[in-house]
């Protein structure tokens, strides 16, 4: 069994960048390698139909692969969604749900919600949760024009809170434009982080996410970088 035991978070520069697919792939790889890995979604909005924890669980073939905090119907940032839906969500409860997942024997994987500055609950943002849970991060970003600014600012926001960024995944990478072809090198120079690229995946069913991520990302290398958290 590969010796990868570190808890970590998969966060994004924005919504829709591919955090859930990357999370499913990494958790699936860990479980296939013999680890009792579990993803936790701090809160879910746009529910139904959106249910990222259910996607990860289905992709990994077991409900034990994922859990979720409060689910809210409006497709908005959690704190805003709760206000619109006239519901109450509690940051302490969300934190405790995530901390419980990290306290398990196997690796815990926090999946972010939208980007880092998304309002979560009680005036706290996603980046605050990641910082207070004290976990290293894998940052998922878009591949094309504009990602240099968004990604570098996200890395800066994490580092300001002493969060280790172990690597960047540029998702939906096709290399068809000059921006795509140069972004990986430039981002490595700007941030000092290793940058990985992942092409568009054909996902007809959730299980395809695990196979696709494992095929196109150097998963063991990505996860090994999480183990080298210099902040510890």
From Swiss-Prot:
Residues annotated as binding substrate: 45
Enzyme Commission numbers on file: 6.3.3.3
A cellular component term, taken from the record's GO annotations: cytosol
Pathway participation: Cofactor biosynthesis; biotin biosynthesis; biotin from 7,8-diaminononanoate: step 1/2
Transmembrane segments: none
Cell compartment(s), UniProt: Cytoplasm
GO-annotated molecular function: ATP binding; dethiobiotin synthase activity; magnesium ion binding
Major site of localization recorded for this protein: cytoplasm
Protein residues bound to ATP: 16-21, 52, 111-114, 171-172, 200-202, 207
Record's keyword terms, sorted: ATP-binding, Biotin biosynthesis, Cytoplasm, Ligase, Magnesium, Metal-binding, Nucleotide-binding, Plasmid
Enzymatic reactions: (7R,8S)-7,8-diammoniononanoate + CO2 + ATP = (4R,5S)-dethiobiotin + ADP + phosphate + 3 H(+); (7R,8S)-8-amino-7-(carboxyamino)nonanoate + ATP = (4R,5S)-dethiobiotin + ADP + phosphate + H(+)
GO biological processes: biotin biosynthetic process
Function: Catalyzes a mechanistically unusual reaction, the ATP-dependent insertion of CO2 between the N7 and N8 nitrogen atoms of 7,8-diaminopelargonic acid (DAPA, also called 7,8-diammoniononanoate) to form a ureido ring. This archaea does not encode bioA (which catalyzes the formation of the precursor for this reaction in the cannonical pathway), instead it encodes bioU, which replaces bioA and also performs the first half of the cannonical BioD reaction. Thus in this archaea BioD has a different substrate.
Similarity field: Belongs to the dethiobiotin synthetase family.
Subunit: Homodimer.
Entry-linked NCBIfam families: bioD (TIGR00347)
Protein name according to UniProt: ATP-dependent dethiobiotin synthetase BioD
Natural source organism: Haloferax mediterranei (strain ATCC 33500 / DSM 1411 / JCM 8866 / NBRC 14739 / NCIMB 2177 / R-4)
UniProt gene name: bioD
């Amino acid at each position: 069994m590969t010796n990868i035991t570190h808890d970590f978070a998969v966060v994004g520069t924005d919504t829709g960048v591919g955090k859930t697919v990357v999370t499913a792939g990494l958790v699936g790889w860990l479980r296939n390698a013999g680890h009792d890995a579990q993803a936790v979604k701090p809160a879910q909005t746009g529910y139904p139909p959106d249910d990222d924890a259910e996607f990860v669980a289905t992709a990994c073939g077991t409900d034990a692969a994922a859990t979720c905090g409060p689910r809210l119907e409006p497709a908005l940032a959690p704190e805003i969604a709760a206000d619109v839906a006239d519901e109450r969500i509690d940051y302490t409860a969300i934190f405790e749900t995530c901390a419980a997942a990290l306290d398990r024997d196997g690796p815990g994987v926090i999946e972010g919600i939208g980007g880092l500055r998304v309002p979560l609950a009680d005036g706290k943002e996603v980046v605050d949760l990641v910082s207070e849970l004290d976990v290293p991060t894998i940052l998922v970003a878009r591949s094309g024009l504009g990602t240099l600014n968004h990604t570098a600012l996200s890395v800066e926001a994490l580092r300001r809170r002493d969060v280790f960024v172990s690597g960047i995944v540029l998702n939906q990478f096709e290399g068809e434009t000059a921006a795509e072809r140069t972004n990986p090198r430039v981002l490595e120079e700007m941030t000092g982080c290793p940058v990985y690229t992942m092409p568009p995946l054909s996902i007809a069913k959730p299980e395809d996410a695990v196979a696709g991520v494992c095929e196109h990302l150097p998963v063991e290398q990505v996860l090994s970088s999480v183990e080298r958290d210099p902040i510890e």
